[in-house]
Design a protein with these regions (language model features):
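Alpha-helical transmembrane segments and their immediate juxtamembrane cytosolic regions
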Residues: 1-348
Length: 348
């Protein structure tokens, strides 16, 4: 296994499972957002779908990304170069997944702002900016885990303040959306989402600098996290209300420190559960396939968006429950088969 920078790292089955499950949850939530009719979206099924596509997805991707960035020994220039490439790749993906829609805009069939779709602040653009920022912070903070942890808290805490501050002359709205703000095309801005990268980064450094923590057996961890699980379960209604409301100053995309804290508690509890699954069932064939999905997360993320994004031009908010289920299986199978084909072509 290699990290984002080509450094050799021993394959982590738990991380692969986390990412694999996240991809599956991600596909269904994108279908719920794009395809499903408003009445289904507003139902308990819709709220459940959005919750599964909330803390189980983006925070997992970003925290795992931060965790493995802490392994990297690459210089700043590599972080900057990789960050720029990822950011530009995100813009290219925005364009490609909206190709059907953009063609109709060009043809005059739809009167929409094309930049809304091309300059959407999504996960890939966030990953690129996160690499840039992390590369710079590594020079200043070195391996001081507490500085990354405090920075994560600050990023999450000031996000609502930045959103309320609104526009500045330095950053026009289309570009400010990548950093902060509640514009409709600002899905994953740096504030607050970079906080999860920093949380994962600091978590890895804490473990590295506290060998005792790594030696705690899974049974002891389960006992420690029983109160955390209880707290997470009791407060699911609070979290679900946020994950079901995507936009606006109090929505999922622009949440503040309270939801960030809840997600961290959830991630730690969820990590213990997935670690337990890996220890007891890690050799299972189905879970092995989920791990493969996790290993190919970036490629599968791109493929599923190319499929869903272009179909959404025709199917936007028009599908019922059974159609949603059908589309989930179809898109998931198509994504995986395409990924297998691409993987085979890429092999020497």
């Amino acid at each position: 296994m290699t990290d984002l920078h080509g450094n050799r790292i021993k394959r982590d089955g738990t991380a692969d499972l986390l990412k694999g499950f996240a991809v599956l949850f991600m596909i269904q939530v994108h279908l719920m957002e794009q395809f499903v009719s408003p009445d289904i979206y507003s139902s308990l099924i819709g709220k459940t779908s959005m919750f599964l596509g909330g803390p189980f997805c983006a925070p997992v991707f970003l925290a795992v990304m931060g965790y493995f960035l802490a392994y990297s020994s690459k210089p700043l220039f590599y972080f900057l170069k990789r960050g720029v490439l990822l950011f530009l790749g995100g813009i290219l993906l925005n364009t490609a997944r909206s190709a059907n829609l953009l063609i109709q805009i060009i043809q005059g069939k739809l009167e929409l702002d094309p930049w809304f779709y091309i300059l959407g602040a999504d996960i890939l653009t966030l990953a690129g900016l996160s690499l840039l920022l992390t590369g710079i912070m590594r020079i200043m903070f070195r391996e001081k885990a507490w500085l990354y942890a405090i920075s994560a808290i600050i990023v999450a805490a000031i996000s609502p303040l930045l959103n309320r501050a609104g526009s500045t002359g330095l950053f026009p709205s289309h570009f400010r959306a990548f950093l902060w703000g509640t514009e409709a095309w600002s899905y994953f801005p740096v504030f607050p989402w970079f906080a999860y990268v920093l949380a994962g980064y600091s978590f890895r450094l804490f473990l590295k600098q506290s060998p005792v923590a790594m030696k705690i057996d899974i049974q002891t961890r389960i006992i420690y996290f029983i109160p955390a699980w209880i707290g997470v379960i009791i407060t699911i209604p609070f979290a679900s209300a946020i994950t079901h409301n995507l936009d606006g100053p109090d929505g999922y995309y622009h949440h503040g420190i309270l939801f960030f804290g809840w997600v961290l508690l959830f991630l730690l509890s969820y990590l213990v559960v997935v670690k337990l699954i890996e220890i007891n069932c890690g050799e299972n064939r189905i879970l092995g396939f989920v791990k493969w999905i996790g290993q190919k997360v970036t490629m599968l993320y791109i493929i599923q968006w190319l499929i869903i994004g272009n179909l959404a031009t025709w199917l936007f908010h028009s599908q019922g429950l059974f159609q949603f289920i059908g589309w989930f299986f179809l898109v998931t199978i198509a994504t995986i088969l395409t990924g297998l084909l691409v993987d085979k072509i890429r092999l020497p």
